Structures are given as C-alpha cells and as structure tokens.
Amino acid sequence: MKKLLVAVVILFTTMASAQKNSILLGGNVGFSSEKIGESKLENFEFSPKVGYQFADQWTAGVEGSIMNVKTKGTDTAEKYKIGGFVRYTVPLSDVFSVFGDLGAGYQSTNVNDAKGMYASLTPALFINMKRGFGLNFSIGGINYDNLDGKNDPRQERFGFNFGKTLNIGISKNFGL
C-alpha cells in the first residue's frame, strides 16, 4: 500500500510576548492529500482566531474552523467549529516564549447532520523576530471531540499527539 500525505500548514496566532491590552488576530490554513490505490482524499481547513490580551500572560478570545473533506467517489463533507480559547504565555527571554492554548466549543458536520463538542490543549514555542512579528512552533497536543448525528452511532475521539505533527506559523500582535 502506497500512501502520500502532503501537509501545508500556516499558523497565524498572537505574539506570545505581547503586552497587556493588545489584540490577537490569527488562525491557520491547512491542506492535505492522500492517495491509496485508486482512492484519493483531499482535506482543506481554515481556522481563524481573534482575542484580547487582558493581562501580561493571559489572552482570551473566539476561534472557529471550516473544514472541507473531498473523497473520490463520495460527497464532499463539511465541518464547522466555533468556540472560545484561553492562552497562557511564559516568556523565557526577549526572543523565546512558550505558551499553551486551551480551546473548547461547538462543532457540526453535514454528514448525517451531526453536532457535538470539542476541546483541545496545544503547547507551542514562540520566536520573536522583529516589531511584533514572530514564528510559532507546535508539535501536537491533546484533543477530544464528539459528534452525534441522524441514523449514525455517536462518535467520540480522544487524541494525544506529540511529535507526530509540526505546525509552523507567523504571528503579529496589534497594540491598542
């Protein structure tokens, strides 16, 4: 069995060393393609994020996600998420910081009109480049989600994924 997985992920999140009373604008874009024999799967995701840094190390806001999954020979599946997040940042120096994002919310998909909840915890490293621009690196996290649809058994997933994925992003913080 031959498997090809191409992933392009751009992660735009807040500047981890941002100052109090600043706005976070960001998100990520991802694409993957997988082919096994005659079967082909394509996945596209866009996940925006908006928040407010209310204390030197704390940010809270709203996050969302739109995912489109196309499988050869079947209907296209669409999945939507909307929820909140909170971020705690620990500066290590003027250049490096680590942060953790905790998010939770509502999700739905057009497959069997399923609806449910999600939650995730993602640790990351921030590298401050210049004037509020920086790079973010995360290598996985912990996540849980459930979906319950018409004529379909309830789905529950728990993931513990460290070191299997790498997300690299650009970030910018806007002061008020």
Question: Which stretches of residues belong to each language-model region?
Answer:
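Cleavable N-terminal export/targeting peptides
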Residues: M1-S22, G175-L176
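Gram-negative (and chloroplast) outer-membrane scaffold detector with strong preference
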Residues: F31, S47-L135, N167, K172-L176
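Transmembrane beta-barrel outer-membrane domains
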Residues: K20-S22, S39-N43, D75-K81, N112-Y118, ...
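Surface-exposed strand-loop-strand hairpins of Gram-negative outer-membrane beta-barrel proteins
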Residues: F31-K49, E63, K150, R154-E156
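Hydrophobic secondary-structure block in the mid-to-C-terminal portion of proteins
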Residues: G141-L176
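Short, hydrophobic/glycine-enriched beta-strand segments
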Residues: L24-N28
